[in-house]
Amino acid sequence: RANGRKSFLRFYDGMDIRPRETEITVALKRLVTDASRIVFLTGHGERSLYWNDKGGLYSLIQRNGRNALVNQGFDVDTLNLTGRTVIPEDIDILVIAAPEKRLSPQEQGLLDSYIAKGGNLIITGEPGKQELMNGLVKNLGIGFKEGIILQHEEADWEEDFIVGDIAESGAQQTGVGAGLLARQYQVAFPGTTALSFNAGYGFQGVPIVEYAGDTLMLALKRQLGGEEQRIIVSGDADWFSTEGLALRKDDVRLNNFGLFMEMLHYMTYQQFPVDNSRPSPTDDTHYLDIADIGWIKGLFIGLIPLLVLGGAIGFR
């Protein structure tokens, strides 16, 4: 544009290389509005955007991938808190993905200040890190329960491979998982702990993903400064890794990527990714009487074959 704002519309890797309506809409929207800024915390062994192995998040920044965040309306960056005095206010979503080490007291103070000011946040943990994670979220009313969730329904699966259900209440209140619920999708959490919630910290807690009575993902929200603060916490970090977003299992309709996109849509107040879905048509069923079947049968068995035969003879 004349004001210097630029937007890129890319061709992508794979068989379907051309941009679709969603990517075209995103590119146009970025010319008239700011992209959402999503920042990943580093410095404590968190899942890295630059890992392309198990647990890595590289697919989120691979520019030639259709589903990369940059192609869905996001500016992506990392943040190391060492030497900082404040977390920047222009961050739309701060992601803390399964840290391996505790934040220092000064870093924890910066995070607590960011939360107190109404910053939006995604936090993911892992089994075995409950004590560390509970220290991180101590002011949110969230608890990472001891142990690991196991399943015994599918003998061919790993015991810690959990297929969770979208919570209807959460989908209704936040929209996260609503599209999956409507199309009867589930999500896979390969190694997760359960979450607890205490409402005494000023947040409303809404379950997003559940399994056998346990909450695996929880949304927190509260009104602060005239705007709703939104925080999402999950007991697993693998579900949105490069491998996790592509997980498939026979006889189960999994859609981790869909959950990830709907989560970001919620966290950015419906700005990005762009939602180009349409309402399902209401007039999609036609009912026939018994009397109608006769002429339909005659049409397909008699008239149409005769027309085809006549056309073939005429063509010769």
Report each predicted region and the residues it spans:
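Hydrophobic targeting/anchoring helices
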Residues: R1-R63, A68, P273-S277, T285-G302, ...
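Acidic, S/T/G-rich, low-cysteine, solvent-exposed domains in lumenal/extracellular/periplasmic regions
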Residues: L49, K54-F272
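A glycine-rich phosphate-binding loop feature that marks nucleotide/adenosyl-phosphate handling sites
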Residues: E153, S280-T282
